[in-house]
Amino acid sequence: PASAARGALETMEWQIGLFDSLPKESQTAFLMVSAENIDRIVPMMDSMVAEWLAGDADGLAELMNEGLTDPALADALLYKRNENWAEWINTRLERPGTVFIAVGAGHLAGQKSVQDYLTQRGLTVERVQ
């Protein structure tokens, strides 16, 4: 409903600051890979959506991670954020009320996904369709 409380797991300022916190080499490598693969973005997104709709989390994780060869980049863009979100979710679930959380599908696939971190905190996680 329109009266429902809304919030964000991260602010835009925080996300921009995330890139500033990366080593310059990681920033440059990410920019170069992004520029070199600009023509592959739409087909890759289509493949990612197909993997998600098929319920193939491993296939989605493989697609997501093929461009994250820099450990500092993977840690900053995915793993630490997933862990932070899982902690927020775990804490929020201790309070009454209904919570709807939406994140990009890439955060829900593979090792160190949001689900992995929630499971480590003793929560039961299952995909529903």
State where each predicted segment sits:
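C-terminal structured interaction module
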Residues: 98-129
